């Protein structure tokens, strides 16, 4: 059993008889003699999708749930469900759009490196690669000679995500975007 200090985003744990998927982990260090660090965890109950915020002491023992990852590719949308196909055995994994709302601006049919997380055989979340390639559908015209400046302009991507890009980037270009901080990285 791992300690609370070992838990990470997108792990599944059992807590108070229920299975939760961890979305965020924040470490706060106590002042003075109060003791060790406290980990504030935002997690979602797998069965109902309810958000729960919990605090754990660094040395508190945590029980991990039966959890596995599967390489998958986005296939299609079925109403409010997004269907991902397992790359090995073509098993379809249906995920409600609310469960993957944070990841959706980076998901296209050409996105590679997507992993579907399953808990007890049930799909609960996806994990994206560190960066994805997306096409700019709308931005201000590019400015010649603007590569020497660090000024940026807004650009709307093929998924609807709006990010800041350098002035020399034009509509129709494919760019690499960080899925961690939602920022322009380079041309693809």
Swiss-Prot record:
GO terms for molecular function: translation elongation factor activity. It comes from the Bacteria. Transmembrane segments: none annotated. GO terms for cellular component: cytoplasm. GO terms for biological process: peptide biosynthetic process. PANTHER family: ELONGATION FACTOR P (PTHR30053), TRANSLATION ELONGATION FACTOR KOW-LIKE DOMAIN-CONTAINING PROTEIN (PTHR30053:SF14). Belongs to the elongation factor P family. This is Elongation factor P-like protein. It comes from Saccharophagus degradans (strain 2-40 / ATCC 43961 / DSM 17024).
